Amino acid sequence: MLRLYALGAGVACIALAILVQGLLPIAIPESRETRATRAVRNELGEVKWVWHEASPYTAPEELGRRVYQREGCWYCHSQYVRPVAGESQRWGPVSEVGEYAHDRPHLLSTRRIGPDLTRVGLKVSDHWHFAHHWAPRDVVPDTIMPEFRWLYRKARVPLVDGAERPALGASDALRAIFTFRADAPIPLYPSPDGLAFAAQTDGTPVLDVENLPAPYDRPETWRGRTLTIVAPTDELRGLVAYTQKLGTNRGAWRDAFEPQALAVSVMSIPQTEGQVDRGRVVYGRRCAGCHGVEGDGNGPVATFLDPRPRNFTLGSFKFRSTPSGSLPTDGDLYRTLTRGVRWTAMPTWHELPEKDRVAVIAYVKTFSPRWQEERPEPAIAIGDPPPTTPARLARGKTLYAQAKCAECHGEGGRGDGPAAAGLRDDSRFPIRPTDFTRGQFKAGGDVRDLYRTMTTGLDGTPMPSFADSMTDDERWAISAYVLSLSAFRDPLTGAPLSLDEAARARLNAPDAGRFASPRLALDPTAPPDLAGQPKALVRFHKGILGEGR
């Protein structure tokens, strides 16, 4: 009899599992939801929320998803921002059903041995991921993530004496990786231990050590050495593309993410011995992998990164509220550290304790003698921006052409101007103009951030200051126009979103309170009087989460 009871209990449990985990989810209407609330920037530069179809994976992203499953990434990484205290402040907006419309199977996972990846898309550049999969502990020292070096193509190449500098020796392994097109040189910047990364392979690899910091800029440093040259396989490119896709069906949510909206220009950080000592420890754990132990921007994974990490020994900083040529304020450094630098390998560090952020800034200031010899000039005053109107945007477009912004950034703002390919920073490394259509502004996505950049310039780059050549009003107009180039576009691809004119008009309406959160997202399919009303996102947990979560 006991065996019969046990058998019946087993069958009942199996049936219950099939019902709860198989049949009920299919029956729930939310399981067929293909839309999610998406943050979009309207033409006025404001971030509004709208219900929008989730986009499917591209072929490379699908390949990457299969690699993600095969390599067991989902064993440690979850893909679900839970509706509990603190999750939305740490990771981003709470997950919605529609985000997973194209996931077969779902990879929600339950364990978080590694970080949750729901919102990892566009947090850092592709190049950061290339470095991370090759040498995880050089990027995140306390990680337990293993290396995935079988996802790279590799060649060991001896160096030979060239006419003026070392050159790559002949190698069949190298020819198996690169096409050796004569009109497409691919510069290689080796790390101190002889590792060189190439993101592209359709061209001719060329060793370039002249721009590296001393002593690695000297030919004799490399004489007789053998380099390890690595390039990503199609599987790794797909894995990175899949990773960058995660969370982007929620659009430009980072521009409305409170922890990254820090605005500060003036603060004073004590340069005490204890502060510097603490900063040295933080720097060694969080920064040295990219910026190098000496702060020269030549860390062990710097070869993977484009743009290159900042060389702190030069005392030149891009993102400042001080005039061109001046050192930044402590507040500028704190803002950059907290926000990160979008679409580069510099992540946001808003989760790092404030004491650690303050301390590492004090330590970074020990790398260059400029900090002992000079004081930052006073920060520029940035008031409230003028209202953005169609007339102001039209004026900004005219000024954009007159100021020859298109020479670098292109007429459509895609970063494809005629001068773009030849641009170099002060260290002679290639540097790409920003693609405005994707809204990934390195100094921040608010019109004040763009105005600050227009006024101060970006030291160490070809981006000049327009403080003397343009009036305040002209700089505000260009800033508003540049911001509008990313209106109603996908931040991942820069492609226009499928929103009709009526929906765009409602999102452009100058009413700051409407459509300002996922809970109040515009539903283009609803009648106009109900379009921005709260909508229950998780119907079957109403009693726990509340209406409209």
Each language-model region and where it sits:
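Hydrophobic membrane-insertion alpha-helices, especially the h-region
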Residues: 7-22
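Ser/Thr/Pro/Gly-rich low-complexity linker/stalk segments immediately outside membranes or between
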Residues: 25-40
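Electrostatic cytochrome c docking/interface patches
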Residues: 36-69, 83-84, 115, 226, ...
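Extracytoplasmic electron-transfer domains, predominantly the class I c-type cytochrome c fold
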Residues: 54, 58-61, 86-226, 230-233, ...
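Sequence/structural segment immediately N-terminal to covalent heme-attachment motifs in c-type
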Residues: 56-79, 93-96, 273-293, 388-414, ...
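Short pre-active-site segment immediately N-terminal to redox-active cysteine/selenocysteine motifs
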Residues: 69-75, 80, 113-116, 235, ...
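Accessory recognition modules or surfaces
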Residues: 225, 245-275, 288-313
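Inter-heme linker and motif-flanking segments adjacent to c-type heme-binding CXXCH motifs
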Residues: 246-253, 272, 296-298, 343-349, ...
